[in-house]
Amino acid sequence: MYDNKFSEDVGSFFRSPVREIFKRVDLNAIYSFAGGYPSADTFPLEEIRQTMSDVIGKYGGQAFQYGATQGVMQLRQAVAERYSVPVERVQITSSSQQGIDVCTRVLVDPGDVILTSSPSYLGALQSLRSYRADIRG
């Protein structure tokens, strides 16, 4: 009934293979590296707690506000200084997947041939498919 209301590109959206894996696996019964699901025991909770306390102590509620889309300026400046590049050329992303998606959006046109290894990172393949790349590998 509503199929004709969606954009033409909606057909390029695929179900997440990682989500499909998670549906079929009892994540408490195994240590699976298939979906990037580390053991909860490996998280440095005390260090995270202390870091959060330090950040809140220094920045208060401002730490939880939206920031610049290119990333927090202090972090961008530190990265620019470390790698001797102009700060205007530094983009901070919130995850590797966001970085892959931004790069794909900027660099890949529909129909561009992209050579990949097999197997490849599923998140990258999804991003490439959503921008209608011709994936070979």
Cite the ranges covered by each PLM segment.
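Conserved core of the PLP fold type I
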Residues: Y59-G137
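N-terminal "arm"/small-domain region of PLP-dependent enzymes with the aminotransferase-like
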Residues: M1-Q65
